[in-house]
Amino acid sequence: MKALILYLKEVRRTIKSADETCRTAVKYGIKPELFAGLVPSKANEYIKEHKLGFYEPGPKLFRIKNAKGGVRGCMIGHLKMWKEVVKRNETTMILEHDSRVVSRTWNQDFEDILHLDAHKFEDDADSNTQPRVEEWEFSRKGEIQMNGAYGYMIKPHAAKRLIQGAYEDGITATDMFIKGKYVKIQVAKPRAVYVSGKRSYETSLTMNRNFNL
């Protein structure tokens, strides 16, 4: 299984962190490949060039998220990876630089997207159970959405549908954009991936001041 690991070549911390992600991926039978994302200023250029709008169905949360440079940069990074998945026509694992692979439960059948961590910053309540795939039921603002986009499997047809949705409906925070309207989301248990810290890829984009936002 191949994995794309999203990082920022302009932010040294994400490079070191992505190297650790690679190490953990190899340990569990995955072939990792670093994938350079875009800092907010370049993401804004990409959005303008591709005539992308913003998904703002009404709730204030979407407007707040869309106003953040880190949110825009993160989403464009994932969008570019989805395009790469379609180009290669291969089921692929998507990881962010602060993801850590901890098991082989990623290696299970799924339909469109397989979320690799049901518990985000919490302990894994499923750690001593048999590997399985379950329906993803997390809901936010009336939509079934991902909760964190730091680790998931995606099939080419699902990547294509997400790309279509981005151009038709507009973009927002990645984990709010990946939703039941476009794809079927399932979750692997016990977790295959965890996020190593609460400073996410999205936050790295927003907090770092070594590049022009």
Language model region names:
Residues M1-L95, S99-L213:
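An acidic/histidine-cluster motif and surrounding catalytic segment
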